[in-house]
Amino acid sequence: MAVLSSVSSLIPFSYGATRLTSKASLASRTSGFNLSSRWNSTRNSPMLYLSRAVTNNSGTTEISDNETAPRTYSWPDNKRPRVCILGGGFGGLYTALRLESLVWPEDKKPQVVLVDQSERFVFKPMLYELLSGEVDVWEIAPRFSDLLTNTGIQFLRDRVKTLLPCDHLGVNGSEISVTGGTVLLESGFKIEYDWLVLALGAESKLDVVPGAMELAFPFYTLEDAIRVNEKLSKLERKNFKDGSAIKVAVVGCGYAGVELAATISERLQDRGIVQSINVSKNILTSAPDGNREAAMKVLTSRKVQLLLGYLVQSIKRASNLEEDEGYFLELQPAERGLESQIIEADIVLWTVGAKPLLTKLEPSGPNVLPLNARGQAETDETLRVKGHPRIFALGDSSSLRDSNGKILPTTAQVAFQEADFTGWNIWAAINNRPLLPFRFQNLGEMMTLGRYDAAISPSFIEGLTLEGPIGHAARKLAYLIRLPTDEHRFKVGISWFAKSAVDSIALLQSNLTKVLSGS
């Protein structure tokens, strides 16, 4: 995806909260993972309910009388600051690791708890490599328990239910709160915090077209990638039996759509037909020219059919039989001079639209976070939520604007840089130092175009685009450097080097065979 990919998305699950310590995680977890294993997940995403805090005379937050008192998360130290981070994607995890890396006065080093509904951190820009077979799941989706083994960061696998912030009490001259507030989790846990970080991510927006929610495959999470891989494998087995071409429809020609089309067309080769649909008459409308041109060359060489200037009106089953897995997509022209048409597909991949998981439910109230129309928290330039000096927001949860007044894109590159500033500004706030305003540095954009192909347009050399195997190697190196923790980077680096050596030997053997056979 462009500039790395969008930040972490949370998928509902039925597990209760689990506190993972280093010893427990080592004893009970392994790093193995089967890509073909079934994931039972729903597409209904978690909602963040903002409820009115009931404050008594002493300034503490209480639960409403008609609710059962939740269990309180026990912090190890009652004196040191308490930092609760919601969301374990690029924004949340890297903020936690940044806090861990800073030098603290002994009595001020914060206790950090990270809450996420998944047991794994997902490096989303490389989900495409799961479809091409370039990477293993453990390489791009390590367990939090493994990543946090040698840190003081605690991990809770749970779902956020309610926020009860009380730092708004210190705004506009009112009494200053002695605590930041409380987070209620779906399992019944209550976390009292001094500082809160909102990094809840987003989910695919499938409810804009009839049939998309029920029939289309999003490509946004690890679970999505596994489902798509399983579906493609099923279609490949069917193709092997009857020789029928595999018809793939990709909705959207942004970075995600183009990367998917390039990866799948390479995987299927002459066994499949890939059609990419886009409302604009161009692909990658916001990308550098070099990336767009490189992508067009690859898509053309792999015979990807581009249906540009079309809107998807609806998605329907090809028949009323559940076992019939074909679909019809009704396309309406978004540009003059085009005619409506209906195309058929064996699988529909949806890559357009995302909605933040931070959602405001109450129209008013002193503790309601200020959200924009997209459901993102309004923040100041230090990444603090406006009106809530003890709450920071980043990634998909934040609506920070650049120097030109435009909202920053919700990419992993932005979240990665915001995490660095968020960690530092929490340090500064705890130590009574000035907070730093966030300044985004665009390092460029890169995308995968297949197993040995990619395109990179670095921002520091105008007009330069690295393509083909060189771009592919540079992209993997850049992402290797961005992986969390030195230990994980080392393990993945060794694994990728070994795979590269095996591929090189296989290629050499293939070339020698061709030479010896005279072909």
Curated annotation (Swiss-Prot):
One molecular function GO term is: NADH:ubiquinone reductase (non-electrogenic) activity
Q: Which cofactor does it need?
A: FAD
Q: Which residues bind FAD?
A: 82-118
Q: Which Pfam families match?
A: Pyr_redox_2
Where does this one sit in the cell? Mitochondrion; Mitochondrion inner membrane; Plastid, Chloroplast; Plastid, Chloroplast, Plastoglobule
Q: Phenotype upon knockout? A: No visible phenotype. Increased photosensitivity to high light.
UniProt protein name: Alternative NAD(P)H-ubiquinone oxidoreductase C1, chloroplastic/mitochondrial
From which source organism is this entry? Arabidopsis thaliana (Mouse-ear cress)
